């Protein structure tokens, strides 16, 4: 492993860790950054699975107290069973649609132009959602009804389009469906666990032949980097949403997306030939 490969692993690990749980699309940033630094091919597909798994493990660690409370309360606490049921219900739409359409989406939509367009459109929707009057019906994730969970689950499927953002779609969906800002954000984190683990297991099995012993050092660097920066991002976001809206993320999405589109339109970067 040379210095440049190690540097690429660090950069992409940082990008994954920082963006996975912010409403700005980690997949979109990975596609764009990987293209800029020339990290692609079969190794990149395997590497992405590893760093996404690291990011979700960071959330598992951050919410380990709540997870243990739910696990040990399944047999005796109705709220633990209700929470688990809501999580599974919200998870199912992504399972069904992911199995049916994942390959088609990866083939035709995993490119910087799609990402940039989705960033802009998603940013505009976020601004619209933030400026609507919020009527909070649910202050805590334990108080959610099954209908809230199912609707958020369907909204999460929009994130199959790269650039949309899984966390962004579920958080904004939660706000629109009556969840408080804290409840929507926390449920988005919890929903990420089965969704991302399921996606990682599915992709890992499907592309198992891509994992080579020679790539272990690269994978290790990316894993550790992604885990650390995901922890930082999750803690920072939980503090941020206590006193701020998501408007700053919306404007970032719009500006970043327009910048990518501008570089393509004026011929500065040939994004149209890039592929994730």
From Swiss-Prot:
> What subcellular compartments does it reside in?
Cell inner membrane
Under catalytic activity, the entry for this protein gives: di-trans,octa-cis-undecaprenyl diphosphate + H2O = di-trans,octa-cis-undecaprenyl phosphate + phosphate + H(+)
Q: How does it sit in the membrane?
A: Multi-pass membrane protein
GO terms (molecular function) for this protein are: undecaprenyl-diphosphatase activity
- Cellular component, GO annotation: plasma membrane
**Known NCBIfam families for this protein?**
PRK00281.1-2, PRK00281.1-4, undec_PP_bacA
Q: What does this protein do?
A: Catalyzes the dephosphorylation of undecaprenyl diphosphate (UPP). Confers resistance to bacitracin.
The protein's name: Undecaprenyl-diphosphatase
């Amino acid at each position: 492993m040379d210095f440049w490969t190690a540097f690429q692993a660090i950069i992409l690990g940082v990008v994954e860790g920082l963006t996975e749980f912010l409403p700005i699309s980690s997949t979109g940033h990975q596609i764009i950054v990987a293209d800029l630094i020339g990290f692609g091919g079969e190794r990149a597909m395997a590497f992405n699975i590893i760093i996404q798994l690291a990011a979700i493990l960071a959330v598992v660690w951050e919410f380990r107290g709540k997870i243990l409370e739910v696990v040990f309360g399944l047999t005796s606490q109705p709220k633990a069973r209700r929470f688990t049921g809501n999580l599974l219900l919200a998870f199912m739409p992504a399972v069904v649609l992911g199995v049916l359409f994942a390959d088609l989406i990866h083939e035709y939509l995993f490119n910087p132009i799609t990402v940039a367009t989705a960033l802009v459109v998603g940013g505009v929707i976020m601004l619209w959602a933030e400026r609507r009057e919020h009527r909070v019906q649910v202050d805590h994730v334990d108080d959610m009804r099954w209908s809230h969970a199912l609707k958020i689950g369907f909204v999460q499927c929009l994130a199959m389009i790269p650039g949309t953002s899984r966390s962004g779609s579920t958080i904004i969906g939660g706000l629109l469906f009556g969840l408080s800002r804290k409840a929507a954000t926390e449920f988005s984190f919890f929903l990420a666990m089965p969704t991302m683990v399921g996606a990682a297991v599915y992709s890992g099995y499907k592309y198992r032949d891509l994992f080579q012993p020679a790539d272990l050092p690269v994978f290790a660097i990316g894993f550790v980097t992604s885990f650390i920066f995901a922890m930082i991002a999750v803690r920072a976001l939980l503090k941020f949403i206590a006193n701020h809206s998501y408007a700053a993320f919306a404007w970032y999405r719009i500006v970043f997306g327009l910048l990518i589109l501008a570089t393509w339109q004026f011929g500065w970067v040939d994004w149209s030939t890039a592929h994730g």
